[in-house]
């Protein structure tokens, strides 16, 4: 299925889920405080500064239900609602000073300490620091690329370089097994957190958490085209298989590193979880029109 067809398929289904929305106006606010007032647990200027200064998503990414930033924020708000006394501070695309080896970086790690990476959201809860990397619709229309050559060069690593290079090569050799689950991005984030693990000594446990969107049976039942249903169901099943295999690989790396206080997990949230919080907002209609269907 091509991207245009997939976009149309999702649009039709979401319109059925929310039949009272006309999707005809164009009144979306510039200030996301109006749309997400419940997210403003920190001063607005500080939050916008994190986004503007980060290397990742720009400030307006917070509007987009199909952006990784937005999905990670939704995940956080669900936890915040369930654990109001336990969450300790949200960070939006906060610069955490983690070097990554990327093609656009001229100097190789570990010498280039200027390069900073962005995780969508990270927070502390129950003596555990969660680093959240999220994906919304990307697995349904994108593919996974192999690690660049820099990740295969042992000179670019610090502690336990042999282990990291071994798994970097193993990952690339089996990259076809992760055609739609972005294992390479998770590998990079895990490496980055490991390289700066001393920063997190104040917290006894670390979790790299991959958050994804669950396409429910209710949503699939709203899709008219049998061909589209077949495509999405197969893609969903494949994603589940690749995700399980990827999480297993990442935790094997952690085990070999004897990194006892770290782990990798995956958690799904469906459309009701993600959209329910803002459905009654006066700007929800245009929000959905602009961004939900702008894959």
Pin down the residues of each PLM region.
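Active-site beta-strand-loop-beta-strand hairpin of nuclease catalytic cores
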Residues: 122-131, 194-200
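A short, conserved, highly charged catalytic patch centered on acidic carboxylates
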Residues: 121, 135-145
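Polybasic (Lys/Arg-rich)
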Residues: 222-295
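Short, solvent-exposed loop/turn segments at secondary-structure junctions
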Residues: 95-100, 108, 128, 136-139, ...
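Acidic, metal/cofactor-coordinating or nucleic-acid-engaging core segments within structured domains
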Residues: 141-208
